Amino acid sequence: PRSKSLRWICGDEPRLSIRRLVAVDFARPYSSGIAIYDGLTPDEALRVTGTAKTTATICTDSTDEALYMTDIESLKCIVARSNGKAVLSRIICGQSQALAKDTVAVALDYFKNTPNNFNILLHTPETGTWIVSTPERLLDMKLDSGRISTMALAGTMPTPADGLCQWDIKNIREQAIVSDEIIRQLNKAHVQNIRNYTCNVASGAVTHICTHIYGTTASPNAYRELLDILSPTPALGGWPRHTALQLIRKFEKHPRQLYGGYISIEDDKTAQAFVTLRCAHTDNQG
């Protein structure tokens, strides 16, 4: 489906900002292979608004916690045989009078807690309204030079009061697996001069292990090709990818919609895509 109107808030700082685009903006649901918004003109694509409203309703279809934990245990037994992993998601629903009154105000207030994230309030008639705050850049490409960067973001822990993270073996191992898989995919896509470094990245109340990965490509169509290669990320789906996606389709009872997909912003010099990692979906009236 295509949308005739797209309203959003975005930027590295929690404030309204206008982006004049000359190419396309699109969002893709998790593992769908379909771009929801694609080929829109700049005038069609962006509206910065302080009046977007949505009506929050009581949601009665949260994922049952007992069933969710049962599925997790069943999944562990299956993936242990292949030394892999599959990542199940769940839905937590609720009601917010503040959200029903003014979605924009709620989003801006939340974004104050995540100033280093990519923060966006997105609305289309087809998808409803989504509040997204993500630290994860799926892909950044300089279109003139072919320089690309991406990241592996797997290890997670609550941010300690002193800011000094002591990572356990599980987080370190999973970070290495995700990093190695991304680098393997980039090598398959003939990305050259691949290099990386690892650091800690704070995002709100949690801190992640983050491996920044860089390279160069000569392919003129590399941006879209690399998006298809990198998404869904191992941290959101699991590994090996084909097996993990099969297990997710078997065990999950709900569509992920935009969760775990990505949002892309392009202009004539740079193309960037961000994983819709942390997000909340309101109803689609607005």
What is each of the regions a protein language model found here?
Residues 1-29:
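An N-terminal JmjN-like helical accessory module and its immediate linker preceding a catalytic domain
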Residues 2, 16, 90, 95-177, ...:
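An anion-binding catalytic pocket shared by soluble metabolic enzymes
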Residues 32-46, 272-283:
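Structural signature of FAD isoalloxazine-binding scaffolds in flavoprotein oxidoreductases
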Residues 41-73, 95-96, 149-249:
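Contiguous alpha-helical scaffold segments within structured protein domains
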Residues 84-90, 121-124, 241, 259-260:
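Short coil/turn segments at secondary-structure boundaries
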Residues 124-128, 183, 198-206, 262-267:
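A glycine-rich phosphate-binding loop feature that marks nucleotide/adenosyl-phosphate handling sites
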Residues 237-243, 247-286:
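Glycine-rich, small/acidic residue-mixed loop/short-helix segments
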